Structure formats: structure tokens, C-alpha cells
Amino acid sequence: MGTTRVCSEVSSGSSKSLSQSLTVSTSTTETVNGFHEFKICGYSLAKGVGVGKYVASDTFMVGGYSWAIYFYPDGKSPEDNSSYVSLFIALASEGADVRALFELTLVDQSGNGKHKVHSHFGRALDSGPYTLKYRGSMWGYKRFFRRSSLESSDYLKENSLLVRCRVGVVKSVTEGPRYYNIPVPVSNLGQQLGNLLESGKGCDVVFQVDGETFNAHKLVLATRSPVFNAQLFGPLGDRNTKCITIEDMEAPIFKVLLHFIYWDELPDMQELIGTDSTLASTLVAQHLLAAADRYALERLKAICESKLCEGVAINTVATTLALAEQHHCLQLKAVCLKFVALPENLKAVMQTDGFDYLKESCPSLLTELLQYVARLSEHSVIVSGHRKEIFADGCDASGRRVKPRLH
């Protein structure tokens, strides 16, 4: 990190004139840091794929750029094949002269904390950040670890390795003088509408839900939900309606729905369901997603999708997948398909009650799932090495400059 002050004299003259014309700006250079963990399962099966062939992590974002970790079980270059494994970080998105610091850590899985760390961060003052010139440029080590030592070490556990990566992208910002600053309070519109709901003032419609009643305001409902707008003020609606019965929804779910309509945020879910159980939270999110789709509350639907994505698990993924299909949640559906199709998950998911429900409610998804499993098998993360070897400086083995692409 570094800070540079630049002072400029706008005019010359007396000392009084000089003091009045002096302006100051500050340039701050710092790193935007990010971390990624990459677990390599089935190490013994990855061996023997050939020199220059690698196992690739999923891409991850740091500092506005996409990155990936490449592990070469048989070495990156022919001269390293017999003795070493290779490990690199690659720029996976378009970018010119991306300056960054890197750190690669092979985690000691015995719990003793004796990790193998190769870090560029500690050497930054000596050599400065490393510059990646274009997509596919790499930083790392051809001779990261001697293979014989690795295979008899605590870094290899249950035939798997764990790599932790740290990337620090260098960013510079220049700021000029600030002559004034007037703080602006954050919006409290949601709180005001929520207080209106809780007070009961002006309520003009009552909902009957699963034996419970809820008061609300027609204009607020119609403003927030196109479905309520059509029901209350549309050509087929009844503007004089005073009571509406909601079928096929539990009262706690409708209460959360109503809270979101007024507050534009979810209540404390742990307080609502009385537990911090992940399973209970997932079930509530599933019901709430269906309710959000029913009343066209797109932001609430997206929030539920996000929570279900974060909590995807063996015992709930099948029902979540069915829900995503029924309510047209394409991103959530893709996440669930990817999770179920993983070899270590597929058998366990098929033994759940949720999978039986999936087969009954969405039989067409089984075909999609089989196709997804087949695609994963065809496009293994172990990439065939029929392309030329590309080095960090952007040259191939013959020394000609190339523009590498990641696949």
C-alpha cells in the first residue's frame, strides 16, 4: 500500500496569494483482497492424466476480475513430471495489465497447522505486485511440492487435498479536497409503513388465513403487489371488499408476507420459527417463495431463492428443485441440478423422501437431471491437454506470443 500527496500551485505572487491558491489531492493505492478454498477429491485418480493437464477450480471474483486455481497432478512441464506437482492462479476474465499479489496455501489436514504457504504478499516491497497481461496469464509454482513427500504427508487426507488461495488486486484512487459534507439519513419508509400496519390505523381490509385474521391497507397492498392490485382495484375486482379469505397458505407465512409488503425486509426468522435450525429455515423459505410468486413480489422471491441457494443440502435439495421448477426460478434450479448431479451427492439425494416427491410432481426434471449428469461426465474438470502450453508471460513453448483462453 502507498499514499502519494500531490500539491499544485495555481498562481504565483505574494505568500498570501500562494496560501490561498494551494490545493491538495491524495492518491491511495491499496489491495482489494479475496479468498477461495479449492478441495481436490480423488487425488489418486487424478494422477496419470499427463503433463500439462490440470484440475481446475470453479471461477471466483476478486477486485472485479474472475480467477481460477489450476492443479497439475503430473506437473506443468515435462521436466517436472517425475518429481513435482504444480499449482497456479490464473486470470479467468478479460483484463489488461492486472496488478495483483498472490498467496497459495496447501492446508495441513491433520489439524497441526503446519500449512505449506507460498506468498507474494510478504515480498511485495522487494519486487512489487505481479502483472497479469491478459486472460489466461498465471502466477504460481511449477515445482510446488515434491510428489513423493506430498503423498506421505498430512496434506493428503482421505485421498483429498485442500488448497487455500488469497488474491489481492491492486487499486488506486485519487481524491480531491472536500469543501463540505452534509450527511443524509437513510430511508425509513419501510419503518414508517410498518408502524402504520402495527398501529392498525386506517386499515380497510381483513384477511382470514388458516383461522387467524390480519388487518391491512388496500392501497399499500395494491401498490406493492400487482396481484393484490388486480384483486382489489382491477376490472374484475370488488373495491368494496372488506374481508378476503386466503386458501392454501399457513398463517405464519402470510404474516411474514405482510411484514415484507410493509417493511420491505424480512422479520427475524429465528424469532419467528423459534429455532435456529437450518432445516426449519429452509422449509419457511420454500413456503415463502411460493407465496411471493403467488403475489408477484419479485424482490421477496429473489431473497428466498438466495436463502435456499445458500442452504442447499442433501435432505432438502429435491423439494427445493421441484419448487424452483414449479415457480420458474431458473438460477435456483441450476444450482440444485448441479448439486444433485455431483457423484458424492446423487445417491444420497435419491434416497430422500424429497426425491420421491420430485419424481411424482416434476417427472420431466428426471430427464434434465440425467442429461446434466451426462454433461458433467463429458466435461470433466480434468481438462484434456490438446492445446499448447501457455506460460505466465503469454508465450507458448516455441516463444511465440499468444492470447490464451480459459475453458
Curated annotation (Swiss-Prot):
The lineage of its organism: Eukaryota, Viridiplantae, Streptophyta, Embryophyta, Tracheophyta. The keyword Transmembrane helix does not apply. This is BTB/POZ and MATH domain-containing protein 1. Its main location: nucleus. It holds the Pfam family MATH_2. It is found in: Nucleus. GO terms for molecular function: identical protein binding. May act as a substrate-specific adapter of an E3 ubiquitin-protein ligase complex (CUL3-RBX1-BTB) which mediates the ubiquitination and subsequent proteasomal degradation of target proteins. Induction: By drought. It comes from Arabidopsis thaliana (Mouse-ear cress). GO terms for biological process: cellular response to salt stress; cellular response to water deprivation; protein ubiquitination; response to osmotic stress. InterPro entries: BACK_BPM_SPOP (IPR056423), BPM1-6 (IPR045005), BPM_C (IPR034090), BTB/POZ_dom (IPR000210), MATH/TRAF_dom (IPR002083), SKP1/BTB/POZ_sf (IPR011333), TRAF-like (IPR008974). The BTB/POZ domain mediates the interaction with some component of ubiquitin ligase complexes. Residues 203-270 form the BTB domain. Ubiquitous. The keyword NAD does not apply. Homodimer or heterodimer with BPM3, BPM5 and BPM6. Interacts with CUL3A and CUL3B. Interacts with RAP2-4 and RAP2-13. Binds to MYB56 at the promoter of FLOWERING LOCUS T (FT). Pathway: Protein modification; protein ubiquitination. One of its GO terms (cellular component) is nucleus.
